[in-house]
């Protein structure tokens, strides 16, 4: 295999990986809206004393 063929194969793999990763990135944006929102699980837990997030779980009960 020549250098030109190996470089072409490398570019093909890089471009394929980039194209495949775009749809998964845009699909996850909608699912992360709650995590980006101020009224997420950690924010609500401060008002009612419950938290299921590992960062505040040692200070509050999960309530599940």
UniProtKB/Swiss-Prot annotation:
Main localization (coarse): secreted
Annotated propeptide span(s): 22-47
Pfam families: Toxin_8
An example molecular function term from Gene Ontology annotations: toxin activity
Entry-annotated residues carrying Cysteine amide: 62
Secretion signal span: 1-21
Locations listed in the record: Secreted
This protein's UniProt keywords: Acetylcholine receptor inhibiting toxin, Amidation, Cleavage on pair of basic residues, Disulfide bond, Ion channel impairing toxin, Neurotoxin, Postsynaptic neurotoxin, Secreted, Signal, Toxin
Family to which this protein belongs: Belongs to the conotoxin A superfamily.
Function (record text): Alpha-conotoxins act on postsynaptic membranes, they bind to the nicotinic acetylcholine receptors (nAChR) and thus inhibit them.
Identification of the protein by name: Alpha-conotoxin-like Ac1.1b
Organism: Conus achatinus
């Amino acid at each position: 295999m020549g250098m030109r063929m190996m470089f072409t194969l490398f570019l093909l793999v890089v471009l394929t990986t980039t194209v495949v990763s775009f749809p998964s990135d845009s699909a996850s944006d909608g699912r992360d809206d709650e995590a980006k929102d101020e009224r997420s699980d950690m924010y609500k837990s401060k008002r009612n004393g419950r938290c299921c997030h590992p960062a505040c779980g040692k200070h509050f009960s999960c309530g599940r």
